[in-house]
């Protein structure tokens, strides 16, 4: 019977050691990964680098990269998985602006103004 008790004690000690090992950590957690961009949310710069447009929660604003002066603001609506409609006001000209854009990749937005002018915005990270 004493042999059976020893075997049982060793088995219990082994189980207890395994439970303790499961409670320990192997070191600091890895830093959280940045969330992938969702739709057009974020900052975009034009091809010439003169205007920075920021899209957040259905609103957009464009500022001059050299002075920070606000050039335009308004709203945007995702009209499909990769298409967006942008409407607002040019604050310099005090005229309405309207654009349709296609999200070509997570970092490129191809746009056409209501007057037919094409331009490309690149996501700023």
Curated annotation (Swiss-Prot):
Belongs to the rhizobiaceae omp10 lipoprotein family. Residues 1-22 form the signal peptide. A lipid is attached at residue 23 (N-palmitoyl cysteine). A lipid is attached at residue 23 (S-diacylglycerol cysteine). It is a lipid-anchor. It is found in: Cell outer membrane. The lineage of its organism: Bacteria, Pseudomonadati, Pseudomonadota, Alphaproteobacteria, Hyphomicrobiales. One of its GO terms (cellular component) is cell outer membrane. This is Outer membrane lipoprotein omp10 homolog. Keywords: Cell outer membrane, Lipoprotein, Membrane, Palmitate, Signal.
